[in-house]
Amino acid sequence: MSITRYGTVQKGAGGKPLPFARAVEADGWLYVSGQVAMENGEIIDGNIVAQTHKTIQNVLAILEEAGYGVEHVVRCGVWLDDPRDFWTFNSIYQQYFGEHPPARACVQSSMMVDCKVEIDCVAYKAKDK
């Protein structure tokens, strides 16, 4: 079995190096690390709507880089800073995952400063034989 790591040299807020891969692929499984609404090493300004769009776009970019699509996502984990954002988050989430809804857990959690949402996921794609 081979293991491929994506984004092992990355920087977070303030340009500090992050000690984990953005995603790891093994045997057809892709594990995407928690993504936030980060752009150029900083959390974007904005409400739950803007941050949810950016966070999901970051997840989709990693999936695409690894050769996966939204249809391959089997599970998502979601952390919301404010549980009152749940229904707003769901309406945006459905725009991206509506055709291929994965299993999902969603919990409230204190987040890093200015971060309103974090999403990780697991995707699976059968290897060509």
PLM regions: where:
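N-terminal presequence-like segments and the immediate start of the first folded domain
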Residues: 1-57, 61-74, 80-129
